[in-house]
Amino acid sequence: MYLCPNKPKLQSTKNFKIMDYKIIDIEGVGDVYAEKLTAAGINKVSELLEKCADPKGRKALAEATEISEKLILRWTNHADLFRINGVGPQFSELLEKAGVDTVKEFRHRVAENLQPKLEEINAQYNICGRVPSIAEVQKMIDQAKELEPKMTY
């Protein structure tokens, strides 16, 4: 079912569970940004979400790394989506292109409407190896409904 075959181990923190990818695994981070984030103490996706879930944290990281707040917000949104089982780097990118950038947004979607949109976008941009079925998207939506929102703006 998973769209990312080499998924890391599930890590738990006090408020959420997340697949603990390396920071460089987020689409668009790359070596240069990963080095800046690592120098600021951000090595894992869970650390990014923990530190940057609120505007104050994003601003502080932007100042420390000289990375734009806009990019940090985008990456933190992806990190938020990683909390959903089956969502990894590529699928979070596809979801973003479909207008779903956080767990809170995902929970309000209708699988029967979202899944064809994902198919359409993936056909255009070739982001993922495969797009999940309507049933798989529904399971993700159901999980999003159970997760506590992390992101604040």
Task: Annotate each predicted stretch with a short phrase.
Residues 2-18:
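Short, Lys/Arg-enriched N-terminal segments with co-localized hydrophobic residues
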